[in-house]
Structure formats: C-alpha cells, structure tokens
Amino acid sequence: KCCKKGGPRKCPPEGMTXFYERIFRI
C-alpha cells in the first residue's frame, strides 16, 4: 500500500491511511 498511485514514498502509520490520503491524495 506504500507509494500507491504515485503517492508519498513513506508508508502511513497504522490507522492513518485515510488521513494521509486526504493530505497527499494517495
């Protein structure tokens, strides 16, 4: 799930995926 769709290379912390999706638009 890391780097998917050209998103950030870092993996979001557990339970923070959605949070990262909103910020980085993964």
Swiss-Prot record:
Keywords noted in UniProt: Antibiotic, Antimicrobial, Glycoprotein, Secreted
Domain of life, per lineage: Eukaryota
Localisation: Secreted
Any one GO biological process: defense response to bacterium
Main localization of the protein described in the UniProt heading: secreted
Post-translational modifications reported in the UniProt record: Glycosylated.
UniProt signal peptide: none
Transcription regulation listed as a keyword: no
UniProt keyword annotation of Secreted present: yes
One GO cellular component term: extracellular region
Function: Exhibits antibacterial activity. May play a role in protection against parasite settlement.
Protein name from the UniProt record: Mucus envelope protein
Organism: Scarus vetula
